[in-house]
Amino acid sequence: MKRDEKILCLGDNSSNDAWAHTLTKKIAEENESIFRGQINDVNQDIVAGYYHVDLVTLSEREILSIIQKFDDVVLLDQSIDKYSHAHVFTSTWKFIKHLKQAGHHVHVINSKNMDFLDYWDDLLKKNKSFCLYPWVKSVSYDDHHTLCTQSMTPVTKLSDMKNWKDDPGYTVVRNKMLKGQKIPNCTACYDQEAVGENVSIRRHETIEWAALLHLKSINELKDITSPSYFELRFSNKCNITCRSCSGHFSHLIQKENDQIKDEKFQTIVDKQAFSSTGGDELIQWDNIKRVYVGGGESTVQPELYRFMRKCISNNNTDFEFRIGTNGVRISDKLFDLFKHFKNLTFSLSIDGTPKVDEYIRWGTEANDKYSNMQRLKNQGHPIALNFVMSIWNISHIGEILQYFDKAYPGSPVHMNKAGYNGDIISPFLFPDKDVVKESIAKAKKTQVYFSNEQRTKFLIDSVDKFYSSDKSVDFEKLKKFFYYNDTLDRVRGVALKDYIPELERCRKFVT
């Protein structure tokens, strides 16, 4: 690198010791150049010298814009302990892969720090079954254990974790995965990857947990004796009735479905029952890295209060704690408890702009949701948005992402396709293609689209590809959707035309 060149260094500078800042300055001095400091503005004028950007504070889109102004790019390949979080470490690794694939030259200093992620990436490409979850995660329902929430079929039954490592059910799954044999419980990830999706839960979480646990190879799995990740779902008690959900995760939906005396409707809805669960007594605190509490709606469940008070009284508050919530009702008592957890983050379920969100997630009050999220942010708790893409919101996906940019700036968006009744509420069923294409064009100009969440970008691109093709929607499924949706509207006393008129106008395609 020459003295008169413009050099950009990439690193995580959010840790207390400002490691990236210090190292960039050192490299500039070694190359007899000038250290110009950190870039915080994409419009900043650039002259010869060494600059660095913080991989935490700037989005992928912003960094890509900045890179165009430089002669060379240097990755400050920090060891994982120098990153603010393992997620930033893995996101950086993915970003560098994208840069190289796009033709950017990236000069890497001491690349061995990230080489082990290449190992796991290669393994996942060769072994289409392998996933780290059976070695790191516990999801329990009344002593029944599942592999993850994408698969509710139990693999074993355990009343405590003493035999977790050698449990026959887990052992069968682990051995099959090591041999590359497909697992019946894991079809959700297989289906995603079958259409070219390389950001399935299997792929994403394996890379993430390899980083979190500093696993260098598959040979180290034999040393894992207890799970590091516990997912707790105390009950299906909930305070709203989401159209893309089922009675399994909302007792109100379960109650509503039971009251609808319509044989055709009953053949459509998911009837899987929720078993009451605890699970927190199984946690092995010596090894814990992450706990996720979902529902139902976590904030209306007394077990969440009990669990948090138990953690506080036992001084177990430093783990990575995630709570899934619809954000509608959060009590002052909960806000007081939240203050004790410094690594607490929230996953907010939100499916549209306020009016659309209130229709899809029936019982939601958008103003209360927004106020509660601002209060959480003021407490210093990061918020991620959990968005379910469906026929209800695909026609104005652009407006929705613009709203997210404005109302929740900087919050990552975890985008998923509908799971329950997914075939009849699919985002690929909207028959007026021009409406969707126009909205997709808006979506591709948002910060959300250019964020570091690969899954979000992939899903938007896949929808764009479908609606730009000559493929037709499945009108039989569309007809079934209107029947399903009309039944819910009739029970709830609302009308689709008052909330999503462009979808109501599509009724003409099936009548």
Put a short name on every predicted segment:
Residues L8-T22:
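Glycine-rich adenosine-cofactor-binding loop
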Residues T22-N31:
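A short, Lys/Arg-enriched amphipathic alpha-helix followed by its capping loop at the start of a domain
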Residues L23, S91-F95, G278-E281, F307, ...:
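A general structural detector for well-ordered alpha-helical segments in enzyme core domains, enriched
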Residues E32-Q44:
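A short beta-strand-loop structural module common to alpha/beta enzyme folds
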Residues Y50-I63:
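Glycine-rich, highly charged phosphate/nucleotide-binding loops
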Residues N113-D142, T146, V155-S159, Q254, ...:
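Radical SAM enzyme [4Fe-4S]-AdoMet core and its adjacent flexible, acidic
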Residues F116-S235, T241-K264, N485-T511:
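Flexible mid-to-C-terminal extensions adjoining Fe-S/redox cofactors in radical SAM and related proteins
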Residues P227-K237, H248-S275, D286-P302, N314-S331, ...:
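Core AdoMet radical
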